[in-house]
Amino acid sequence: KQFTKCELSQNLYDIDGYGRIALPELICTMFHTSGYDTQAIVENNESTEYGLFQISNALWCKSSQSPQSRNICDITCDKFLDDDITDDIMCAKKILDIKGIDYWIAHKALCTEKLEQWLCEKE
């Protein structure tokens, strides 16, 4: 599913303030991480990242390429590619608990200031 900024804002509403992260920071980070696309897959040197939050099979989820993953979120990685982002959000909260928002490289580089543009402006 390809989300819009406003759709994603509604879906991520319960993360607003979680781990002291403001919603616009998260929306910005997800834009630069996956382009709001639940089917985004990025191959890295030693791991693959899945879905909206680009969750890695090295630590967080299990895939056929990563049977030795610690699988902290106790889930198969392909679950992060469907339209239901409930499980993605649960895993993202674990990542926020353990690693913080800077787990997503885009955050520090692109999403720490001028965040007004990431707010959903309701007509």
Curated annotation (Swiss-Prot):
**Residue intervals of the C-type lysozyme domain:** 1-123
Which cysteines does the record link by disulfide bonds? C6-C120, C28-C111, C61-C77, C73-C91
| Tissue spec | Mammary gland specific. Secreted in milk.
Its domain of life? Eukaryota
Q: What is this protein called?
A: Alpha-lactalbumin
Q: Which PROSITE patterns match?
A: GLYCOSYL_HYDROL_F22_1 (PS00128), GLYCOSYL_HYDROL_F22_2 (PS51348)
Task: Report the record's Gene Ontology biological process terms.
Answer: defense response to Gram-negative bacterium; defense response to Gram-positive bacterium; lactose biosynthetic process
Record's Gene3D superfamilies? 1.10.530.10
Q: Which CDD domains does this one have?
A: LYZ_LA
Q: Where in the cell is it found?
A: Secreted
Q: Which organism is it from?
A: Papio cynocephalus
Q: Which InterPro entries match?
A: Glyco_hydro_22, Glyco_hydro_22_CS, Lactalbumin, Lysozyme-like_dom_sf
**PANTHER family the UniProt entry points to:** ALPHA-LACTALBUMIN, LYSOZYME C
Q: What does this protein do?
A: Regulatory subunit of lactose synthase, changes the substrate specificity of galactosyltransferase in the mammary gland making glucose a good acceptor substrate for this enzyme. This enables LS to synthesize lactose, the major carbohydrate component of milk. In other tissues, galactosyltransferase transfers galactose onto the N-acetylglucosamine of the oligosaccharide chains in glycoproteins.
Determine if Hydrolase is one of this entry's keywords: no
Gene name of the record: LALBA
Q: Which Pfam families match?
A: Lys
